[in-house]
């Protein structure tokens, strides 16, 4: 299992994944990224025409690489720090001895 997959599985199991996802969504909205991607999708659809031959999957394939490059580095760093904090906190909790009451 890759480190990325292990972190993903761990955050799902601890319930932290939804917190990280909520943080990401709010930050992307705050910086205007969502509006930018929405406009990019609209422009691609206008460019391709309205003949219904362009599928959602094709749109996603075309937009995803461009959209990823538009995510500000500050947001990427913030999320990475949040994930590290979560992993560190949970590792420290796992290292603490059990209370034998």
From Swiss-Prot:
GO terms for cellular component: cytoplasm; DUBm complex; nuclear periphery; nuclear pore; nucleoplasm; SAGA complex; transcription export complex 2. The gene is e(y)2. One of its GO terms (molecular function) is C2H2 zinc finger domain binding. The keyword Cytoplasm applies. Coiled coil: none annotated. One of its GO terms (biological process) is positive regulation of transcription by RNA polymerase II. It comes from Drosophila erecta (Fruit fly). Pfam families: EnY2. Belongs to the ENY2 family. It comes from the Eukaryota. This is Enhancer of yellow 2 transcription factor. PANTHER family: ENHANCER OF YELLOW 2 TRANSCRIPTION FACTOR. It is found in: Nucleus, Nucleoplasm; Cytoplasm. Keywords: Activator, Chromatin regulator, Cytoplasm, mRNA transport, Nucleus, Protein transport, Transcription, Transcription regulation, Translocation, Transport.
């Amino acid at each position: 299992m890759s480190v990325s997959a292990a972190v993903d599985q761990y955050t799902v199991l601890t319930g932290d994944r939804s917190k990280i996802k909520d943080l990401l969504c709010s930050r992307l909205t705050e910086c205007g990224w969502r509006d930018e991607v929405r406009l990019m999708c609209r422009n691609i659809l206008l460019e391709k025409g309205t003949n219904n031959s362009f599928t959602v999957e094709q749109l996603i394939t075309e937009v995803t690489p461009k959209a990823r490059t538009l995510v500000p580095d500050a947001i990427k760093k913030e999320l990475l720090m949040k994930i590290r904090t979560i992993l560190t906190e949970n590792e420290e909790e796992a290292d603490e001895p059990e209370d034998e009451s």
